[in-house]
Amino acid sequence: MKKALIAMSGGVDSSVAALLMQQKGYECVGATMKLFENEQAGVKREKTCCSLDDVEDARSVAYRLHMPYYVFNFTANFEKEVMDRFVCAYEKGWTPNPCIDCNRYLKFEKLYLRMQEMQMDTIVTGHYARVVYDEASGRYLLKKGLDNSKDQSYVLYNLTQEQL
């Protein structure tokens, strides 16, 4: 049986993705990446990236789908790979986009490595995008989601061929 690591945000999209993969016969394991200590920053009980509420929502969905669930703590990596880069760029007068670095160096790179460590076959997210294998070029292509109004392919643009 193939195994899928489900990147769970606590939202509807990743929850539905988990259910769909189970229906396709995959053995699924849910995971949420803890990137920021919201509570230490005084942000409490708000729906922000990586909040405790998000973690609990994801854990609840995983429980209902009878799948194991993990929280990967990457807060130190987030500070180094995202916040330090953001501050450095901002001090130079640039207009940094921390989400790009977070997606590239943490959300997808670290999650991909964790997937390999866990001997899983694939990572599944709730992003609206398509990955298509092009026979002519021998490459995977990242394409817009079928519903243009919900397309999130831009979030995934930094993925390598191996990650796609």
Question: Over which residues does each language-model region extend?
Answer:
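ATP-dependent adenylation/nucleotidyltransferase module used to activate substrates
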Residues: M1-N158
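Internal nucleotide-binding/catalytic subdomain
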Residues: N158-L164
